[in-house]
Amino acid sequence: MSQLYASLFYQNEVTEIFSDRALVSYMIEAEVALAQAQAQVGVIPESAAIAISNIAATAIDQIDFDVLAVATGLAGNIAIPFVKQLTAIVKQSDEDAARYVHWGATSQDILDTACILQCRAAMTHVEALIQQCYRTALTQAEQYRSQVMIGRDRKSVV
């Protein structure tokens, strides 16, 4: 985030949605959804999906973001080192379930899904801001509908 423009262009709620922690949370959410969907159709054992879901609920607090940042630079994307950390976290509690973390998915699948989840969450805030702008503009247009005024920009009359 640009500190120079922070007070002009950023909304704290939206900025938080695009934080590193939020991205990893959405990646965890994608991995959980993948495991649950695969269990529903018999691709992985239901017990593995349940274990992955339960363990993932607190996994964000166990992710080492410093290690993840360095490994992301070495790997070329966040997904590969993320999956290694998530798998290790699941393995601490359920070695069998750890085998099914990220089963059949590509790194890009998880990263793309997480990014779309971020965008969806941000759009909730953006839509509310657009509605607020619309209501304000409508109020101003109604209030000053009969007011004659010249057009202008910051420095000159148009």
For the regions a language model picked out, list residue spans one by one.
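A helix-coil-helix interface module used to build multimeric assemblies
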Residues: M1-S156
